[in-house]
């Protein structure tokens, strides 16, 4: 069986990507069913036992900026080795709620860690590995903020200011501009039915 595909969902907190992730994966599995392939759904930080432990630390404990980035990439290495690469090798498709673009957006754009440091970590951990497709849920920070305020107790990232998320969004869009062949941008300011219509277009293009 041919190697599987790797798809990532990205966007600032409150953009709505997690709301649509399972729906997208269910539709994708329907398409892949006759081929015998499966859809593996995962997330970052997380995806492995170590990754989930790191997730609790990263989302809830204050720490040095460079420590934060290093922990993100440590969890990613484990995630690649134990989950992503084995699934792709056996022909399954993997859909991850966040991957490396999030680290560039949050630790780079939002927190201001120099891009060259993140690029060095990316090369070390991933080599040339990149997602086959990244679905970027794009929305104005003020809209995302209103959505976040309507849900559970926020973690340390969700509690950041609109200015932080404006920088994070700008870095996401910069990444998308630099790799347009890899990104599909979804206007997530729309209603749920309209967003799903956009995602149907993404699925049709796979």
UniProtKB/Swiss-Prot annotation:
- What is catalyzed by this enzyme? dTMP + ATP = dTDP + ADP
Please name the top-level EC class of this enzyme.
Answer: transferase
The role this protein plays is:
Phosphorylation of dTMP to form dTDP in both de novo and salvage pathways of dTTP synthesis.
UniProt name for this protein: Thymidylate kinase
Query: Matching CDD domains, A to Z?
Result: TMPK (cd01672)
EC numbers, comma separated: 2.7.4.9
Instruction: Give an example GO cellular component term for this record.
Output: cytosol
Q: Which family does it belong to?
A: Belongs to the thymidylate kinase family.
Record Pfam families: Thymidylate_kin
Which InterPro entries did the record assign? P-loop_NTPase, Thymidylate_kin-like_dom, Thymidylate_kinase
Residues recorded as binding ATP, renumbered to this chain, are 11-18
Q: Which UniProt keywords apply?
A: ATP-binding, Kinase, Nucleotide biosynthesis, Nucleotide-binding, Transferase
Alphabetically, the GO molecular function entries are: ATP binding; dTMP kinase activity
Single Gene Ontology BP term?
dTTP biosynthetic process
